[in-house]
């Protein structure tokens, strides 16, 4: 296209390619990391419960020592953790479930900062406890609920030096890129710790 320069080979060599580690064949974590390295990836998206079955991944297990262990096995395979995934419903209408989900996000943010992962990735939930699609997910009310429940998560992320990145999914509240931008603009979340 006119006006666009072609990427130089030197610049393209600097780009780090990553993979969602749960897309690699099911195997112990160390084996998955070796496969990712062999395939030429430099970083990975780590969704703890989707990737690690040989160690606990509950909130109490996300300790500094565990983070250091994971950093070492990633480094041994010349990989970084680019994104720590946390996929829970921040619009859950059950107050106890919502509180548990929020606590889990805070634990993941803290763990991401220890891992050296600058991003915690998430989806945007549903207006029901089952985390399933219904038309109300795309309502103005649902968007307000999501933004309100996201604020303390983003505030904590800012304190921990971590970015919360949302992934629009059609079945969820934020269902496309333009709505994600609208949610960001319309909220008071002007921090750079939310994308």
Language-model segment annotations:
Residues 14-19, 37, 44, 147-195:
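Acidic/histidine-rich catalytic cores of soluble enzymes
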Residues 56, 87, 132, 139, ...:
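Residues at structural and domain junctions
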Residues 112-134, 160-169:
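Active-site groove signature of glycoside hydrolases
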Residues 1-118, 141, 151, 158:
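N-terminal pre-domain/capping segments
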Residues 88-92, 127-128, 170-174:
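Short, small-residue-enriched loops and turns at beta-alpha junctions
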